């Protein structure tokens, strides 16, 4: 039984091997004509340059924090080493995602000349490289450190490193991509009246670069972090019930191993048998991964735990995933009521479009909240939480681990989106035939849905995983502190501080996008005004200027969100005590979850309302409704691609800070 744990790092290595195999097969595909290669090279150079500058900045911060951990904490050397390993692994996950995306995009565009089948294969397998790399690195790192240290508490540093880099990646990438996107749309579509991805737009390359550094690299680092901290939370809680269930720490690692093999097999399920069935092909892959994982979970549970109730908990986790996907698709799909309502409201102007979009976003929080609440209760009580609260909390953690059984496929779906988006942009800028653009538009339309759906999944898994992390924090501090009571003014003060943190964080992120977009808009206007021949297509815009503007803005403004995530919980714990920090975590998890849902779903609904009008409905392109929808989309962009997704990372970073520094916080506070 002891040797079984080596299955986990082995599974991680196998996942990385298949990621390399798929990457190699993609690179063998044709990259198109000279013009396509030039455009793709510009996107690749911009993406690579930004990532390198971002990682240099993050490296300095990581070294400083690792030194603080080294000198402040017991076993500081091991925890600091784990922190650096987590930071490097998270950065690697993001870089791999970006690297394959900027190579798969042009090959997808080239393959589109032969129809959707081959183009889908290249785009999805490009996404699968990121997905398999993310879960492979996460499981390899977590299990290897546990084997090396023999204590789950010492692996917390790895989770903190992953969380912090994810926050920087989400914040920086989100600011970059949406500043470029908003700037390109406001001047290009509204003022100049030129279509999306038009080579005459000076911000078009920055916009395409942003798809890679924001969506691919950002989501890769985000779900890497989620995978690590959720597995770690289950292991930490499992160590508390090891007297009853001797394999409670090993169990989540084995579930993760089985899910990797299910994901690898399911990649081969994704193929288009008939034209127009792209979404069905993608969901077939996710469904295959889910079914194979559950079959494996059944046998693993019987072998390791000897208690079928834990299998039912994994089923509950998978059901939560399915329901979150369904709800998110409903609120962001062009064929459903919320998006159609926003599109109709656009006919009377931007104001009614904004009002309808906000309404849809607020409404979209109801069902997910009920789903997560039901999942928590079912997972807790089904394993006997009423009799043994420790086992009940472990059940919640296992449900969140089960949610991540589809993480490899979910990351693949998310990364598929920017690959097809870039492919469409390359086809447009290279003036490829209309038939090619039709194929890339079809793939991109599906990609917009998958990006929205995966955000809903990420939020749900964050909420459930954060509860498990909170339970571990509470266990650590309650050993030497009074019980945490909601009628305590100290706890209530902490709840208020935690509740306001997501709003403060979002304000910082939205402000950063607004300032950077302002500079991009002015630069694009300057080029249209001062460079003759751009609109006629006889002069080439200075693409590098816009890339440089958003790069500087992203690197400058990503520091403050990270600072807030680390310093506020530490100050709360040190000055108000561990009970106040517990309240802060409670307020943060609840409000952060709701606000992230509202922003992601509302932003996705605004985006697809615009695309619905561009499909020819409610006036079509160039109409007043279209202009209003573009305004709504530019408001929704930083909602769904900057502030909303970054809230996931904020929630996990703050929880990891609380757990990691809990030995210093115990006994602290002036109240």
UniProtKB/Swiss-Prot annotation:
Mg(2+) 2 binds at residues 208, 211, 421. Homodimer. Its cofactor is Mg(2+). PANTHER family: K(+)-INSENSITIVE PYROPHOSPHATE-ENERGIZED PROTON PUMP (PTHR31998). This is K(+)-insensitive pyrophosphate-energized proton pump. The chain crosses the membrane at residues 4-24, 57-77, 79-99, 128-148, 156-176, 223-243, 249-269, 285-305, 310-330, 365-385, 393-413, 452-472, 490-510, 558-578, 579-599, 650-670. The keyword Cell wall biogenesis/degradation does not apply. InterPro entries: PPase-energised_H-pump. It is an enzyme of class 7 (translocase). It is a multi-pass membrane protein. Keywords: Calcium, Cell membrane, Hydrogen ion transport, Ion transport, Magnesium, Membrane, Metal-binding, Translocase, Transmembrane, Transmembrane helix, Transport. The record marks 170, 215, 222, 641, 652 as: Important for ion transport. The gene is hppA2. Ca(2+) binds at residues 607, 633, 637. Its EC number is 7.1.3.1. It comes from the Archaea. Its main location: membrane. It comes from Methanosarcina mazei (strain ATCC BAA-159 / DSM 3647 / Goe1 / Go1 / JCM 11833 / OCM 88) (Methanosarcina frisia). Substrate binds at residues 178, 640. Proton pump that utilizes the energy of pyrophosphate hydrolysis as the driving force for proton movement across the membrane. Generates a proton motive force. GO terms for molecular function: diphosphate hydrolysis-driven proton transmembrane transporter activity; inorganic diphosphate phosphatase activity; magnesium ion binding. It holds the Pfam family H_PPase. It is found in: Cell membrane. The record marks 451 as: Important for potassium independence. Mg(2+) 1 binds at residues 181, 185.
């Amino acid at each position: 039984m002891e040797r079984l744990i080596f299955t986990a790092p082995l599974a991680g290595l196998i996942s990385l091997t298949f990621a390399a195999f798929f990457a190699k097969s993609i690179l063998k595909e044709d990259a198109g004509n000279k013009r396509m290669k030039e455009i793709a090279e510009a996107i690749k150079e911009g993406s690579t340059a930004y990532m390198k500058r971002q990682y240099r900045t993050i490296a300095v911060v990581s070294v400083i924090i690792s030194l603080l951990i080294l000198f402040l904490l017991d076993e500081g050397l091991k925890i600091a080493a784990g922190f650096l390993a987590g930071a490097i692994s998270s950065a690697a996950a993001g870089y791999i995602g970006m690297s394959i995306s900027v190579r798969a995009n042009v090959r997808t565009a080239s393959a589109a000349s032969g129809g959707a089948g081959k183009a889908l294969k290249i785009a999805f397998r490009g996404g699968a490289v990121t997905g398999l790399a993310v879960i492979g690195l996460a499981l390899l790192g977590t299990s290897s450190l546990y084997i090396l240290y023999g204590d789950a508490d010492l692996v917390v540093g790895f989770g903190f490193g992953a969380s912090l880099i994810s926050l920087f990646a989400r914040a920086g990438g989100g600011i970059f991509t949406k500043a470029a996107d908003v700037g390109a749309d406001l001047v290009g579509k509204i003022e100049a009246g030129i279509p999306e991805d038009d080579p005459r737009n000076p911000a078009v390359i920055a916009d395409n670069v942003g798809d890679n550094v924001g969506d691919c690299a950002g989501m890769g680092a985000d779900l890497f972090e989620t995978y690590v901290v959720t597995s770690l939370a289950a292991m930490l809680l499992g160590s508390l019930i090891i007297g009853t269930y001797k394999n409670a720490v090993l169990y989540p690692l084995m579930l993760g191993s089985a899910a990797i093999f299910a994901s690898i097999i399911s990649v081969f399920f994704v193929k288009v048998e008939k034209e127009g069935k792209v979404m069905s092909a993608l969901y077939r892959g996710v469904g295959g991964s889910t079914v194979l994982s559950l079959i494996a979970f059944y046998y693993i549970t019987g072998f390791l735990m000897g208690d079928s109730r834990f299998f039912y908990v994994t089923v509950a986790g998978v059901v939560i995933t399915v329901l979150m996907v369904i709800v998110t698709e409903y609120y962001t799909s062009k064929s459903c009521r919320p998006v159609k309502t926003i599109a109709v409201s656009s006919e009377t102007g931007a104001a009614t479009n904004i009002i309808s979009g906000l309404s849809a976003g607020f409404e979209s929080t109801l069902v997910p909240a009920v789903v997560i609440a039901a999942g928590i209760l079912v997972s807790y009580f089904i394993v006997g939480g009423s009799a043994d609260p420790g086992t009940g909390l472990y059940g919640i953690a296992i449900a969140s681990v089960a949610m991540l059984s589809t993480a490899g496929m979910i990351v693949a779906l998310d990364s598929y989106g920017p690959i097809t988006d870039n492919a469409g942009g390359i086809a447009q800028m290279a003036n490829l035939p209309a038939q090619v653009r039709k194929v890339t538009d079809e793939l991109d339309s599906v990609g917009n849905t998958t990006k929205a759906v995966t955000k809903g999944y990420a939020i749900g898994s964050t909420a459930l995983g954060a509860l498990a992390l909170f339970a571990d924090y509470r266990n650590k501090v309650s050993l030497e502190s009074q019980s945490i009571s909601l009628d305590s003014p100290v706890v209530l003060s902490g709840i208020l501080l935690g509740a306001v943190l997501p709003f403060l964080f979002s304000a910082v992120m939205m402000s950063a996008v607004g300032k950077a977009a302002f500079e991009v808009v002015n630069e694009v206007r300057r080029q249209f005004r001062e460079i003759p021949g751009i609109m006629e297509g006889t002069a080439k815009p200075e693409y590098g200027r816009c890339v440089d503007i958003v790069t500087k803005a992203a690197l400058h403004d990503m520091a403050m969100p990270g600072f807030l995530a680390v310093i506020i919980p530490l100050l709360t714990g040190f000055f108000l005590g561990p009970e106040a920090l517990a309240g802060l975590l409670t307020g943060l998890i609840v409000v952060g979850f709701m606000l992230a849902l509202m922003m992601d779903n509302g932003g996705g609904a605004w985006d697809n309302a615009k695309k619905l009008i561009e499909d020819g409905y409610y006036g079509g392109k160039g109409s007043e409704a279209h202009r209003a929808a573009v305004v709504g989309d530019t408001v929704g962009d930083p909602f769904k691609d900057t502030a909303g997704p970054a809230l996931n990372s904020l929630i996990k970073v703050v929880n990891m800070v609380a757990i990691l520094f809990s030995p210093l916080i115990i006994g602290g506070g002036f109240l």
